[in-house]
Amino acid sequence: YFSCLDREGKVFDTDKFIWLQGREVWMFSMLYNKVEKRQEWLDCAVQGGEFLKKYGHDGNYNWYFSLDRSGRPLVEPYNIFSYTFATMAFGQLSLATGNQEYADIAKKTFEIILSKVSNPKGKWNKLHPGTRNLKNFALPMILCNLALEIEHLLDPGYLEQTMETCIHEVMDVFYRPELGGIIVENVDMDGNLVDCFEGRQVTPGHAIEAMW
């Protein structure tokens, strides 16, 4: 897939971003699963999934941020949302194909995501530890949707527990009635407001996405 297109649909850059590659695999899989059983949609989904399976990670399902056209890694797997979109892609693709390998990739990647919740960037975290430790809204926001996306691969009890945790984080930690009902993007590790740039940040798109 190429995702860097101008207004006429012409490719202006051939680098490949795992966020967008994963979204396209998910999209073609979802269209096949829920709209119409069109073979060309399934073929597109499988083609993208096979590219990601071969080139998108380091061999241990640590998903790179970007690749060149041929699949050589450009940016290391520092970004946890590469993992989330890979999980969504292979979860939906497993439904479309019945392929157990795709299901296993989705489950393994989801497990890695959960192991990284306390430090999503891992060894690529550039922040100095201990000075201003913050909890970010983006991960619990997307985990709720992610768990529903791979519901067919999760134990029902585990799914319910994950959903309850995410809803608590969204509604009891980041949603702030005392600020007029806005959702802040960052709080401290105890859930308190922080008077700094990051603590004052609001991302309306994330709030809408979480409520959806």
Predicted regions and their residues:
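Glycan-recognition and catalytic cores of secretory/periplasmic carbohydrate-active enzymes
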Residues: Y1-W212
